Amino acid sequence: MSKAHKSWPHRRRNQFSSQRSLKKEMNFFQQQPPPFGTVPPQMTFPPNWQGVEKDPAFLTKDFNLLTLNNQPLPGNTSQPRAKGPENNLHNQYEQKVRPYIDLIDSLRALGVEQDLALPAIAVIGDQSSGKSSVLEALSGVALPRGSGIVTRCPLVLKLKKQPYKAWAGRISYQNTEIELQDPGQVEKEIHKAQNVMAGNGLGISHELISLEITSPEVPDLTIIDLPGIARVAVGNQPRDIGLQIKALIKRYIQRQQTINLVVVPCNVDIATTEALSMAHEVDPEGDRTIGILTKPDLMDRGTEKSIINVVRNLTYPLKKGYMIVKCRGQQEIINRLSLAEATKKEITFFQTHPCFRVLLEEGSATVPRLAERLTAELITHIQKSLPLLEEQIRESHQKATEELRRCGADIPSQDADKMFFLIEKIKMFNQDIEKLIEGEEVVRENETRLYNKIREDFKNWIGILATNTQKVKNIIHEEVEKYEKQYRGKELLGFVNYKTFETIVHQYIQHLVEPALSMLQKAVEIIRQAFVNMAKKHFGEFFNLNHTVQSKIEDIKVRHTEKAENMIQLQFRMEQIVFCQDQIYSVVVKKVREEIFNPLGKPSQNMKLNSHFPINESSVSSFNEIGVHLNAYFSETSTRLANQIPFIIQYFMLRENGDSLQKAMMQILQEKNRYSWLLQEQSETATKRRMLKERIYRLTQARHALCQFSSKEIH
């Protein structure tokens, strides 16, 4: 478990104690004459979400005082506004609720969402589902509306309640930021932003538009509006516009950090809506999906019962349940009905409706209740997500820092600095080459050191020597018999002809030349690849420098391969001279005799290698005698070659080759007029380094923001 996870319960305990004290204050306020806008005492919350996740303790029943337009809900229309308690409640609210939303908004403003998902509420719905009307009612501003695709870019709607301050807005996209002085500017500026980002047509863009609204008449809420789901392309729309929109929506709603707000009109079959189907696909248990029913005034008479069942979570269950709202209709928009008046009409609609009045009493209806509910859900969601978010930011920061380290430092602009930069690069490369030569290079878990790779070929060389020796043993009888028939002169039986012995030795030696040279070529390729990989590691981002080093590796390899090959050929030419020190040879011959004639340490009873010449126990045939000498000499020669050939390969291809490469690298520093050319960097590397620096900056700022937030929570 991370430190962030371990420390969080302590913060939460502190937080809950503050919430309990706040709850006592709320109880005091509720004992006073109800202030303007409070709900009637008999109002209860719908069971479909009350029992699943309780609201944070600091979101009290007086919460609607702080939401839309300060409109009163039914049951309390005449009381004067209690400014004292409301102001105190707002201060407590600002201390406990607003910081969570501000924290996530600040992280989103830093661009942290490019690196990891942040807690959010995303609004999805089919075209003409009433999605824009719901957002208008929440924000108090007119958003783009009409037929077809209206929302063409994700819109982050940041609502911040500021009592006693004038309305203010700001829209941001790409490198543009525009201050808005009037709500009437919003729709025009969003249209303009969408045209810049998605083109003057009907295409879509994945880039975000940020709309921030500060007003005394909005709830504290951040919500992401996504394009409406289109089933078929019309007009000049791309033929795959439906797939594009679904891919964009899925990118947001599949994140575990996102609460999905699914808008469904009452006059359609809820089970067939594409939006709810997409939400179910990414959230099959309905843990983070809230259903919003719209247009209750357009449904057929007599079907109200089915809608009540949906809102009560009896038809298509969601753990977070449903809400129902009535926003401005098209005719009301044409008649310029204000949003404030629309909210009043909505409350009147539910209050006077014979079937839906019960939903109002249960707290499942009206936009003000929806605003309250969404803020509570968002705050709870943020609280749950913060420990994991801290850990993700820490891990992402660490990973980006490591990637930046591998990219290396920026290339200096001054010639003198370029020289020092190049010296450092070559120095590090030479140090790693030296480690390869000495068998001390650092390797990862599944990698093997260079020496071990070569050693495998050296082991195979011992097997080749043993196999060749066995072949000679098998042809001894044939060779001696050939001599007896063709070349024997006046020698008596049993006398070994030295020429026969020497001929067999020469053949044996000659058969080893090709395997030895083959082993050399394998070792050369292994070493060359190791040097090339090291060059890519150090100079891969500098294509000219890397090409120069690769050429030097190849040239030096060819030169030293030729030297090693010549030395191996010389070694085998020397092996044509049959020689061994008497003291050494006599010991080996004695040992071989014992192994052949007395392998178990017992006197030999019968040694007959040729039935044509029966011999007694005291005599030794020419076959046995020449076999003894060949075995003895081959044993000594194999021991010598088993070490000598690997010595030659290591000396020329590792030590000499590596040393020559290091010297050649230092010679590059003499070419001062080529520094700029050598240090030309691949554009991808420069771009990657810049992006990593930006990511590290974002994540550093995010860690700082989380640290400050956590310290405030603790204190």
Swiss-Prot record:
Compositional bias (Basic residues): 1-14
Region of interest called G5 motif, as start-end residue ranges on this chain: 326-329
Source organism, top-level taxon: Eukaryota
Region annotation Disordered: where it falls in the sequence: 1-24, 69-88
UniProt-recorded Gene Ontology molecular function terms: GTP binding; GTPase activity; microtubule binding
InterPro entries on file: Dynamin, Dynamin_GTPase, Dynamin_GTPase_CS, Dynamin_N, Dynamin_stalk, G_DYNAMIN_dom, GED, GED_dom
Region (G4 motif): 294-297
Amino-acid positions noted as binding GTP in the UniProt annotation, renumbered to this chain: 125-132, 225-229, 294-297
Lineage of origin: Eukaryota, Metazoa, Chordata, Craniata, Vertebrata
GO cellular component: cytoplasm; microtubule; nuclear pore; nucleus; plasma membrane; presynapse; synapse
Annotated ranges, domain Dynamin-type G: 115-387
Protein name: Interferon-induced GTP-binding protein Mx2
